[in-house]
């Protein structure tokens, strides 16, 4: 009986793919060695301990319909599009060894004619006249009896978009999260014009089989049919939830300030697990009462644009004379935290 398992996802949904990964990892026998191949459409994937408001340009992501996905491993933020091929290697302990999976990926690249080396913070790089260029980044997760190594290979990623979404707005965040290390990157198409996702998957698969001396048929995982994986529906619901993707952010503080025709406003927020634990409002407005009331309304709210906007709008009935000011304030707050 083979100890290998090969899974290939035909979904581009990051929440679906990460839920599949999590379910397989939790329920796999300790004797099994798994390779999961997948890719995501337009997504910023952040590490388990990262703050999305600090790492990402969340406003531009929303405007461009780019999803946010928090993974269960550590490390930094990355942008995925269909120009990336994602891989996950899983194994039980004591056999789990990230150097083995790194060797497999390097062997796959070598078979395609790309000589790469492992470097620094879990990267694979190629040497160019301009210096080392990163073609792959990885992250890892271990539990008591198993571990996984997952990462991406840059095939034909839109590197300009990567810079757009991973360069955060200059918000005044005093955050305790982990800031990603920006690296010089290169696409494999610069080295192998015309290389495809399917060719890379085939190369990684063959290197996986060669290392273990076994072969196995691929299992195609599709969202058109709910995967036969224990607790998949619950895992997908969690992976796609605001509470997981945003609410798991480390505690941080945010200062917003703006000058309106009717006065200046300064908002101070303390946020924990995506919820405002303290809100202070300062203003030189001649009618400060609605803003003073707003501070109380905001405490306990989720740090979401729509929620903050609703909290501000809810004061209109109480302060109808300041309707215009409150609507202006609501629109500004919603835009500022996106």
Swiss-Prot record:
It is found in: Cytoplasm. InterPro entries: aa-tRNA-synth_II/BPL/LPL (IPR045864), BPL_LPL_catalytic (IPR004143), Lipoate_ligase_A (IPR023741), Lipoate_protein_ligase_C (IPR019491), LipoylTrfase_LipoateP_Ligase (IPR004562). Keywords: ATP-binding, Cytoplasm, Ligase, Nucleotide-binding. Its EC number is 6.3.1.20. ATP binds at residues 71, 76-79, 134. GO terms for molecular function: ATP binding; lipoate-protein ligase activity; lipoyltransferase activity. One of its GO terms (cellular component) is cytosol. NCBIfam families: lipoyltrans. PANTHER family: LIPOATE-PROTEIN LIGASE, LIPOYLTRANSFERASE 1, MITOCHONDRIAL. This is Lipoate-protein ligase A. It comes from Salmonella paratyphi C (strain RKS4594). The gene is lplA.
């Amino acid at each position: 009986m083979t100890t290998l398992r090969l899974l290939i996802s035909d979904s581009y949904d990051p929440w679906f793919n990460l839920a599949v990964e999590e379910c397989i990892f939790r329920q796999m026998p300790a004797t099994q060695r798994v390779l999961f191949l997948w890719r995501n459409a337009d997504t910023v994937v952040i590490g388990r301990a990262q703050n999305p408001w600090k790492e990402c340009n969340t406003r531009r992501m929303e405007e461009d319909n780019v999803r946010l996905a928090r993974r269960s491993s550590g490390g930094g933020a990355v942008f995925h599009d269909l120009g990336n091929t994602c891989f996950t290697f899983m194994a039980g302990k004591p056999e789990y060894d990230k150097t083995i999976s790194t060797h497999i990926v390097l062997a796959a690249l070598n078979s395609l004619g790309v000589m790469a080396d492992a470097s620094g913070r879990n990267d694979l790089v190629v040497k160019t006249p301009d210096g080392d260029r990163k073609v792959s980044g990885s992250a890892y997760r271990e539990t008591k009896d198993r571990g996984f190594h997952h990462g991406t290979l840059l095939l034909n990623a839109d590197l300009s978009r990567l810079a757009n979404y991973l360069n955060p707005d200059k918000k005044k965040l005093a955050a305790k999260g982990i800031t990603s290390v920006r690296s010089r990157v290169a696409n494999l198409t610069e080295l192998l014009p015309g290389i495809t996702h399917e060719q890379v998957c085939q190369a990684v698969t063959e290197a996986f089989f060669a290392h273990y001396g076994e072969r196995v048929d691929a299992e195609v995982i599709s969202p058109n049919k709910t995967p036969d994986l224990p607790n998949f529906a619950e895992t997908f619901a969690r992976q796609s939830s605001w509470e997981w993707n945003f609410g798991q952010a480390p505690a941080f503080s945010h200062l917003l300030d703006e000058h309106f025709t009717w006065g200046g406003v300064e908002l101070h927020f303390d946020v924990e697990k995506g919820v405002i634990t303290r809100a202070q409002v300062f203003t030189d407005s001649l009618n400060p009462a609605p803003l003073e009331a707003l501070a109380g309304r905001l405490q306990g709210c989720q740090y979401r644009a729509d929620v903050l906007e609703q909290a501000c709008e809810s004061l209109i009935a109480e302060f109808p004379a300041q309707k215009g000011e409150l609507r202006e304030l609501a629109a500004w707050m919603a835009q500022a935290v996106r």
